[in-house]
Amino acid sequence: MPKNKTHSGAKKRFRITGSGKVMREQANKRHLLEVKSSKRTRRLSVDQVVSPADVKKIKKLLGR
């Protein structure tokens, strides 16, 4: 049986911490930043924990 392949899109978007939490980056931090306040862009810089409803599916895509 062939090896399972990791989902390329998922491996670019998510990472798993040492304790097993799935982290993601915030949206809206790529372009048109001069319109957004410094406070907003700072807040968007912080990584977020993925919703528990999505964790199982994401871990499967990452081959975990």
Curated annotation (Swiss-Prot):
Keyword match Secreted: no
UniProt cross-references to Gene3D superfamilies, sorted A to Z: 4.10.410.60
SUPFAM superfamilies membership: L35p-like (SSF143034)
Pfam family, one: Ribosomal_L35p
Gene Ontology BP, a term: translation
PROSITE patterns attached to this UniProt entry: RIBOSOMAL_L35
Gene Ontology molecular function: any one: structural constituent of ribosome
GO cellular component: cytosolic large ribosomal subunit
Superkingdom, natural source: Bacteria
This protein's record includes keyword Ribosomal protein: yes
Keywords: Ribonucleoprotein, Ribosomal protein
InterPro entries assigned: Ribosomal_bL35, Ribosomal_bL35-like, Ribosomal_bL35_CS, Ribosomal_bL35_sf
Disulfide topology: none
NCBIfam families in the cross-refs: rpmI_bact (TIGR00001)
Family assignment from sequence similarity: Belongs to the bacterial ribosomal protein bL35 family.
HAMAP family: Ribosomal_bL35 (MF_00514)
Name the UniProt record assigns to this protein: Large ribosomal subunit protein bL35
